[in-house]
């Protein structure tokens, strides 16, 4: 349900202020002055934003839930009083008082933490959060309330975000997508599941012919195309906002993936575990798709179309550090339009069921505390000679909600040696750190490095 806050200031912007005053940094103050003259500006007025689903762990005393508050009045806010109303049980609680560490200024929006108790059983419960008083006075906001869906779970879910980059060596715009994907994977290693799909170029010739079959035509009519959970086509070299939006859509379906080489070192055995933190809605069915990816791919013959004049310009001065490779004249050949020495990461080598999950992986009718598993195998991996370093192979597992067609969750893991203990996914700190010195493109540096930024034993280091 869409709820709109209608206040005096919004009416002023629409009907009172002339066009030359209706925008710009002074518009809020101008509207406030006019409202004060005509006596329609509220003094104590705070409205919350609806956060959607919030997760509360059963057994915990309470959970500090983040909520955003906006001060629509002309008085700084030092405290609010609020109540809870559980719509299912028709029970009220409160009032409670929240004293702010710093006053909330007029026009300011700020996130605060509201303690909420979990339910007595797993599942969803609708909660009305209502701000009754501001600074000890009646709350004048026309919509001083917000509806929350409280999800009581047996364990807090972890959400992995699938980021798919479609690229081609023949495309001089594609470095933007490559940089964006590498950067977001570096910035959020515990939360991003990155896959780079190449379209009709030298890499597409040396990976599986069936990789992402049908999906390239659907999602990459033009490239670059960076999709976040296939819901949001992100643009530019910074896709942080798109990532955060998807990350905020918390799932209640946890998943973990584990992979190991077989005894011959040619096949990868994969096992995925799916555990609901609370029971899914009736009729919901889930299925799993898989991608085998490899990083550190390079070839002396490869050339990536680029544009030195573009990527070395001020337009990219705030770009992630990965863009420096394309802004370095030393990497260019063929008249400043192609780069050599590129290292490609997260490349999709082979995939299974990445349209909407494998048929034999479908899962439904979950019971409380039940963990469902699925296994698959990537066979004949040694035939992909483009993979020079087997330690940089990863398996990505993607959980699809087949009822909604949406991606519910994603996870990734490295491939362990046969017979070794499995590792937990999404915990990069548990993975073996790469020894030696590497440049920012992932290439190992032999001999004494020139001054610059390098990865030394897994840590970023400035060598002078």
Each model region followed by its residue ranges:
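Intrinsically disordered, low-complexity Pro/Gly/Ser/Thr-rich segments with frequent PxxP/GP/PP motifs
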Residues: 90-120
């Amino acid at each position: 349900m869409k709820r709109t806050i209608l206040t005096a200031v919004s009416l002023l912007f629409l009907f009172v202020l002339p066009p030359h005053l209706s925008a710009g940094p002074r518009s809020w103050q101008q509207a406030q002055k006019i409202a004060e003259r005509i006596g329609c500006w509220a003094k104590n007025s705070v409205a919350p934003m609806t956060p959607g689903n919030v997760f509360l762990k059963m057994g915990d005393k309470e959970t500090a839930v983040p909520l955003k508050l906006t001060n629509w009045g002309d008085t700084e806010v030092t405290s609010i009083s609020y109540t809870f109303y559980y719509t299912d049980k028709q029970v009220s609680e409160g009032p409670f008082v929240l004293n702010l560490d710093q006053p909330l200024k007029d026009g300011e929006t700020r996130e605060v933490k509201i303690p909420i108790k979990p339910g007595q059983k797993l599942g969803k419960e609708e909660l009305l959060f209502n701000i009754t008083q501001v600074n000890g006075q009646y709350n004048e906001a026309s919509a001083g309330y917000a509806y929350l869906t409280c999800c009581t779970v047996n364990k807090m879910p972890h959400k992995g975000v699938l980021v798919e980059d479609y690229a081609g060596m023949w495309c001089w715009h594609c470095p933007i997508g490559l940089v964006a994907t590498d950067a977001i994977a570096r910035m959020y290693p515990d939360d991003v599941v990155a896959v780079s799909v190449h379209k009709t170029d030298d890499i597409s010739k040396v990976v599986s012919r069936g990789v992402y079959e049908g999906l390239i035509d659907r999602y990459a009519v033009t490239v670059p195309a960076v999709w976040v959970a296939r819901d949001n086509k992100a643009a530019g070299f910074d896709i942080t906002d798109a990532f955060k939006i998807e990350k905020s859509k918390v799932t209640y379906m946890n998943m973990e993936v584990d992979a190991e080489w077989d005894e011959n070192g040619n096949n990868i055995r994969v096992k995925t575990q799916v555990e609901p933190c609370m029971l899914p809605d009736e009729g919901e069915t889930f299925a799993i798709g898989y991608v085998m990816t490899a990083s550190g791919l390079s070839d002396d013959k490869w050339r990536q179309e680029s544009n030195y004049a573009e990527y070395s310009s001020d337009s990219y001065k705030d770009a992630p550090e990965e863009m420096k490779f394309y802004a370095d004249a030393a990497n260019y050949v063929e008249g400043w339009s192609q780069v050599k020495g590129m290292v490609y990461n997260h490349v999709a080598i082979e995939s299974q069921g990445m349209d909407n999950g494998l048929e034999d992986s479908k899962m439904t009718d979950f019971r409380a505390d039940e963990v469902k598993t699925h296994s698959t195998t990537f066979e004949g991996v040694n035939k992909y000679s483009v993979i020079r370093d087997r330690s940089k192979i990863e398996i990505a597992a993607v959980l699809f909600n087949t009822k909604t067609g949406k991606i519910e969750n994603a996870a990734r893991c490295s491939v362990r040696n046969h017979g070794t203990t499995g590792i937990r996914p999404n915990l990069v700190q548990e993975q073996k750190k790469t020894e030696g010195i590497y440049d920012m493109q992932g290439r190992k540096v032999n001999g004494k490095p020139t001054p610059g930024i390098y990865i030394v034993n897994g840590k970023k280091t400035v060598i002078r």
